[in-house]
C-alpha cells in the first residue's frame, strides 16, 4: 500500500 511505503522511505 502507499501508506506502508510512506514510512519505509522515512
From Swiss-Prot:
Source organism of the structure: Fructilactobacillus sanfranciscensis
The domain of life for this entry's organism is: Bacteria
The conditions that induce or repress this protein are given as:
By elevated hydrostatic pressure.
Q: What is this protein called?
A: Unknown protein 10 from 2D-PAGE
Q: Give the free-text miscellaneous remark of the entry.
A: On the 2D-gel the determined MW of this unknown protein is: 65 kDa.
